[in-house]
């Protein structure tokens, strides 16, 4: 896994947690994006990277789909 080039931003509070949960489940970012797209979220790699890096706001639909893919609750994304 590559290390993050930039520090985390402050546009959201879930990005770091999403990244940690995704890597814990050993899901590559590109595979995760594909799963999101399959579930109806129109997202590209740059936009997703910004979400994990906390440099953009996550939508409610994105949070719902992310929690579903990670088999967790939306609440856990905020912890």
Regions found by a protein language model. Name each.
Residues 1-25:
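A short, Lys/Arg-rich alpha-helix, primarily the initiator
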Residues 17, 47-50, 76:
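Residue-level recognition of specific faces of alpha-helices
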Residues 18, 29, 45, 60-63:
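Helix-turn-helix DNA-binding elements, focusing on the entry/boundary residues of the two helices
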Residues 22, 33, 37, 67:
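The alpha-helix within a helix-turn-helix
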Residues 27-50:
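Short alpha-helical DNA-recognition segment
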Residues 53:
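Short, conserved catalytic or interaction motifs in soluble domains
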Residues 59-76:
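DNA major-groove recognition helix of helix-turn-helix/homeodomain DNA-binding modules
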């Amino acid at each position: 896994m590559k290390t993050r080039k930039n520090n985390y931003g402050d546009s959201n509070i879930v990005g770091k947690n999403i990244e940690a949960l995704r890597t814990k489940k050993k899901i590559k970012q590109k595979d995760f994006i594909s799963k999101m797209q399959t579930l109806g979220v129109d997202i590209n790699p740059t936009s997703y990277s910004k979400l994990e890096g906390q440099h953009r706001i996550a939508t409610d639909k994105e949070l719902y789909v992310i929690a579903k893919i990670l088999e967790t609750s939306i609440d856990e994304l905020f912890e």
